[in-house]
Amino acid sequence: MKKTISLAAVLLAATTPAFAHPGHGAESFAAGVAHPLTGLDHIAVMVAVGLWAALKGQRALWVWPATFVGVMLIGGALGMAHVPVPFVEPGILASVVALGLLVALAVDPPVFVGVLVIGVFAIFHGHAHGAEVAENVGGFEYMTGFAIATASLHAIGIGFALTMQRASLRPAIRAAGAVCVLIGAGLYAGVL
């Protein structure tokens, strides 16, 4: 009896799921990872969140990126469910400029104010990710992919900012914020 149960457990553990339709598993995960990496607006904002969190330091270093990812997932679920959220595209564009300015000007608000600002913008980005998902893509895998890609972009911003701070090159962080503002202006003008 023990051998039968052990064999059944091994066979169960060794099996892989069979999907009757394409777009599940690895394909969905890859689509989720790719989505934030294919838009300059998304890249700029997600790196800017990391930059701003590193400028603030302490709790903001993890609270602000975690807020963005968490609220973005809520927005993604709303988008996938086709729940309308007003002003998504203008909100995304405003987020590029606003977060770039917050970094460029080294604005230092209380952590909860940053959470509110970041949360509002994350809803827009998440909704865009969710609304643009293909019908044949698995939602959980897709959302996992875009959450990991987003967290990675935050980590890039944090890593850059912390490296610049250690090298006494804090103005480089603020310059990166100014680049975000320019990206936002370029997107608004239609040249990017």
Which residue ranges define each predicted feature?
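Membrane metalloprotein/metal-transporter helix-bundle signature
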Residues: 2-192
